Amino acid sequence: MGRAVATPEDLKPRLRGVFHQWAFFAALVAIGVLVGIAGTGTARAAAIVYGIALAAMFGASALYHRINWSERPRRWMRRLDHSAIFLMIAGTYTPFCLLVISEPLALIVLAVVWGGAFAAGVINFAWIDAPKWATAVVGIALGWISVIALPQIPVTEAALLAVGGILYTAGALAYALKRPNPFPRVFGYHEVFHVLVVAAAAIQFAAVAVAVSAG
């Protein structure tokens, strides 16, 4: 197993990974909140799946970005970080497929997003040096599959999901284009991406909470 090694502080912005580190601990609390407000056994199961995906995304990102890994483990951590993004997308769909969307559409969406997340993860591990735009495009495409199910989702939850999706998309574009890059030594384009992801996740968490509490 590789070990973390020290590298010059100016190789990455000082806030790299900080926001996702905080978000990871918030996600642990969020799991408990969702399980506590779940109205049924199915809702609790959906809350757990979503909560694990949420914590996994922020946890993998924090581990990857906060530690100065040596080259070999860094490449593996990058794989894990990117794969956790696709896991989060599938995890976010799960409560709505189990609790809100009617069959057979719910089963179709569930199969597509989990199948897509698995396939994207496999490709990610096989193509570690994929350009940033490729990861962004796959994430955006997988995330916006929900538009086919929006008519079945109540207005409040649908609006929250849409706003979160827009923020995720804006973050993916910032990541792919490497801009805006306001303060490269402290808060660069990647931090813009991370902040937008945290904001998007918080908004979509509210949508999941509504669905779980009513489920």
Model-derived features with residue positions:
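Multi-pass alpha-helical transmembrane bundles in non-GPCR membrane proteins
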Residues: M1-G215
